[in-house]
């Protein structure tokens, strides 16, 4: 099976790629302007591409499966980053058009619960990132009528070793370990965070399924436990003295205060957050 990834150099992609290589030998990763071939021998450039030439590159690659991990995040400060459109919509659209032309293909899309959540301002989709990601769900339904088989996996949050994305849990841990002051919001927002290894296992489960049980379906992965930021801080307070300041900062303009669970949970992951935090806090 020839597998192509988008966003393979991101946090989830870099964790998934070695596991796929071990099982399938090699994968191809679509970056911002190059496609790389990745195997046990390392990574090498397969070709450069533009949005106009990507379709032809896919014809040459002839993938059986594409796993769409690309995520162009929205930043509401400074000049707009068009990758929020390019990564989240343009590349998936071109791939789906390619599969439509073949009258076959399998597409695993990694989505976000922000797509159907509401921000504190009452905006469904939260911000341009979530709104654009939600468009892909509607596209998947369209292309399924042209023999493109999709599985859409909704994530609620991820964490784990070697995560350099600056997510809230790691920001808190870094501040505690460096004895820095960190001003946080009042911390009432609820999080449902899944350990990276469980997410990878769930994706592999979908990749290796061959009985059609996940065909043309949107699924999700989450744990049975929600944690507020306030609860996380209180837990850390029991472990180590720190300079975390709850209420010293404000909620984000597009804050989501609680997860909304709309789709079947494919993988009943255990809540491992406290164990992870305990292992990372320097005593």
UniProtKB/Swiss-Prot annotation:
Residues reported in the UniProt entry to bind NAD(+): 7-13, 48-49, 129, 133
A biological process from GO: O antigen biosynthetic process
Domain of life: Bacteria
One Pfam family from the record: Epimerase
Catalytic activity: CDP-alpha-D-abequose + NADP(+) = CDP-4-dehydro-3,6-dideoxy-alpha-D-glucose + NADPH + H(+)
Record-listed E.C. numbers: 1.1.1.341
Molecular functions per Gene Ontology: oxidoreductase activity
Pathway assigned in UniProt: Bacterial outer membrane biogenesis; LPS O-antigen biosynthesis
UniProt keyword annotation of Transmembrane helix present: no
Entry-linked SUPFAM superfamilies: NAD(P)-binding Rossmann-fold domains
Active site: 129 (proton acceptor)
Keywords assigned by UniProt, alphabetized: Lipopolysaccharide biosynthesis, NADP, Oxidoreductase
Record's function text: The CDP-abequose synthase is involved in lipopolysaccharides (LPS) synthesis containing abequose which are important antigens of the cell surface responsible for the serological O specificity. Derivatives of the 3,6-dideoxyhexose group have a particular highly immunogenic character.
Family: Belongs to the NAD(P)-dependent epimerase/dehydratase family.
Protein name: CDP-abequose synthase
Organism: Yersinia pseudotuberculosis
Biological classification of the source: Bacteria, Pseudomonadati, Pseudomonadota, Gammaproteobacteria, Enterobacterales
């Amino acid at each position: 099976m020839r597998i192509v990834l988008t966003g393979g150099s991101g946090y989830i992609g870099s964790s998934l790629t070695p596991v796929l290589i071990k099982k399938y030998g090699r994968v191809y990763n679509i970056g911002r302007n190059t496609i790389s071939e990745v195997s046990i021998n390392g990574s090498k450039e397969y070709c450069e591409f533009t949005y106009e030439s990507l379709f032809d590159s896919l014809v040459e690659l002839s993938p059986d499966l594409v796993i769409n991990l690309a995520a162009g995040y929205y930043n509401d400060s400074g000049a707009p980053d068009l990758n929020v459109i390019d990564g989240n919509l343009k590349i998936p659209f071109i791939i789906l058009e390619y599969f439509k032309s073949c009258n076959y293909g399998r597409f695993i899309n990694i989505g976000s619960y922000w797509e159907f959540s509401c921000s504190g301002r009452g905006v469904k989709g939260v911000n341009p990132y979530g709104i654009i990601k939600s468009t892909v769900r509607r596209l998947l339904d369209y292309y399924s009528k042209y023999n493109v088989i999709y599985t859409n996996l909704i994530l609620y949050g991820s964490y784990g070793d070697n995560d350099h994305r600056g997510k809230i849990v790691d920001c808190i841990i870094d501040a505690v370990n460096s004895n820095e002051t960190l001003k946080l919001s009042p911390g009432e927002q609820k999080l449902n965070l899944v350990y990276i290894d469980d997410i990878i296992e769930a994706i592999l489960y979908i990749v290796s399924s061959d009985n059609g049980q996940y065909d043309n379906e949107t699924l999700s992965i989450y744990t049975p436990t929600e944690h507020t930021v306030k609860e996380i801080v209180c837990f850390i307070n029991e472990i180590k003295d720190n300079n975390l300041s709850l209420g010293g900062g404000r909620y984000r303009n597009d804050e989501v205060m609680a997860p909304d669970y709309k789709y079947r949970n494919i993988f009943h992951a255990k809540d491992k957050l406290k164990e992870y935090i305990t292992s990372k806090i320097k005593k």
